[in-house]
């Protein structure tokens, strides 16, 4: 039974992470210094440090910028809370919701300055300090956003 659980966890992982120790799973980390909170799916301990893995289930085998932002925030929060070295590359493992197949994609994470700038922009928009915020490129990007109702009043296609 244990062997089948390990096989399922490792299914879809890149070869370099198969057999690696799971350092953290489904855990929340905080960076008080940068005022960030992130819940990571998995982090593996390797000889090069900790490597992040984000698991996604989607009908399309696609990696989005939001995945990179999420993993980049996880990296900052994990490093700040634990002091461990976290790789500036991570993996997004997409499980196809139709076929169940999994495919890993390596991504390069954003730096602290880029994430800090995004956080500052978010805070400015939420507090009304940005007079002309731009809507998301497509309405589907708004589907799960906490601010959808507020934006829907301004951008009629977001409601």
Question: What is each stretch, according to the model?
Answer:
Residues 22-37, 45, 80-159:
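Metal-dependent nuclease catalytic regions and adjoining charged, substrate-binding loops involved
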Residues 68-72, 116:
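Short, well-ordered alpha-helical segments
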